[in-house]
Amino acid sequence: MAELGDYKINYEPLFGPLQLIDVGEAIKRADHPWYNQTLIEVGGVLLRLGVFAGGEYHWHKHQEQDEFFYVIDGRLRIELEGRDPVELAAGMAFSVPRGMLHRPVALEPTQVLMIEESGVAVTGD
């Protein structure tokens, strides 16, 4: 686990193969306003859970990896360098290509699933 300023990031997967993944129960474990938990690693890809009380993450980018966001509940705006922001509601998804400067903003309490390659620096490169 790492606490970086206003973020709590749990890199160790909460689940392994052949385990039932109860995302609702994982959400209940959130103990920080900007909480990030790796749920499982499958074939070199991470499924991560973000539970955000509201507010903004810092501007960052991932040089080598794309990032995928799926909103479970709430509203997430993804601000993108040189492009209009994208607003996501529950059931909506968006992918940010590698190398693009971006900043997620939780417009209200929001739960998000994120997919990234293993080894990603969650806070950006």
Give the positions of each predicted feature.
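Conserved short histidine dyad/triad with adjacent acidic residue
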Residues: 32-33, 46-63
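A short, N-terminal "cap"/entry segment at the start of jelly-roll beta-barrel domains
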Residues: 1-48
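A cytosolic small-molecule/anion-sensing beta-strand core signal
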Residues: 72-73, 89-90, 108, 116
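Glycine- and acidic-residue-biased ligand/ion/polar-headgroup-sensing regions
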Residues: 64-77, 81-82
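Short beta-strand segments in beta-sandwich/barrel cores
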Residues: 47, 57-59, 74-79, 93, ...
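Short acidic-glycine-tyrosine-enriched beta hairpin
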Residues: 82-98
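Ligand-binding loop in jelly-roll beta-barrel domains
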Residues: 98-125
